[in-house]
Amino acid sequence: MAYLVAVTACVSGVAHTYMAAERLEKLCLLEKWGVSIETQGALGTENRLADEDIRRADVALLITDIELAGAERFEHCRYVQCSIYAFLREPQRVMSAVRKVLSAPQQTHLILE
């Protein structure tokens, strides 16, 4: 079973941050992937990812419209990065990218436009 860590963050830090986190949880359940999700919203950082979780993750998914607080934590990881809009509009495209990156070398970074 694959294990993902993710961060969601939008400009206002209200609805879309949490909508993306909720949708990702459901998609990972369908894929039978474990997932831990950190949200960076109006209330600050919630469910902050532990360094150990990031280290053991197969892939990090950075769903953001803003500069993430602590983005350097993911430099050594395979990751897929996309906007909140792209994820909410085309979640299957993003999940397909995650599947591809799962088998890529460490430190593979895929940024979706």
Swiss-Prot record:
Signal peptide: none
GO CC field: cytoplasm; transmembrane transporter complex
Principal place of residence: cytoplasm
This protein's record includes keyword 4Fe-4S: no
Residues recorded as bearing Phosphocysteine in the entry: C10
Residue ranges occupied by any PTS EIIB type-2 domain in the UniProt entry: 1-100
CDD domains for this protein: PTS_IIB_fructose (cd05569)
The protein's Enzyme Commission number: 2.7.1.202
Places the protein is found: Cytoplasm
Catalytic activity as recorded in UniProt: D-fructose(out) + N(pros)-phospho-L-histidyl-[protein] = D-fructose 1-phosphate(in) + L-histidyl-[protein]
Molecular functions (GO terms): kinase activity; protein-N(PI)-phosphohistidine-fructose phosphotransferase system transporter activity; protein-phosphocysteine-D-fructose-phosphotransferase system transporter activity
Key words of the record: Cytoplasm, Kinase, Phosphoprotein, Phosphotransferase system, Sugar transport, Transferase, Transport
Catalytic site: C10
Record keyword Thylakoid present: no
InterPro entries: Bacterial_PTS_Sugar_Transport, PTS_EIIB-like_sf, PTS_EIIB_2, PTS_EIIB_2/3, PTS_IIB_fruc
One Gene Ontology biological process: phosphoenolpyruvate-dependent sugar phosphotransferase system
PANTHER family in the cross-refs: FRUCTOSE-LIKE PERMEASE (PTHR30505), FRUCTOSE-LIKE PTS SYSTEM EIIBC COMPONENT-RELATED (PTHR30505:SF0)
Role description: The phosphoenolpyruvate-dependent sugar phosphotransferase system (sugar PTS), a major carbohydrate active transport system, catalyzes the phosphorylation of incoming sugar substrates concomitantly with their translocation across the cell membrane.
Swiss-Prot/TrEMBL domain comment: The PTS EIIB type-2 domain is phosphorylated by phospho-EIIA on a cysteinyl residue. Then, it transfers the phosphoryl group to the sugar substrate concomitantly with the sugar uptake processed by the PTS EIIC type-2 domain.
NCBIfam families: FRU (TIGR00829), PRK10427.1 (NF007747)
Protein name: PTS system fructose-like EIIB component 3
Gene: frwD
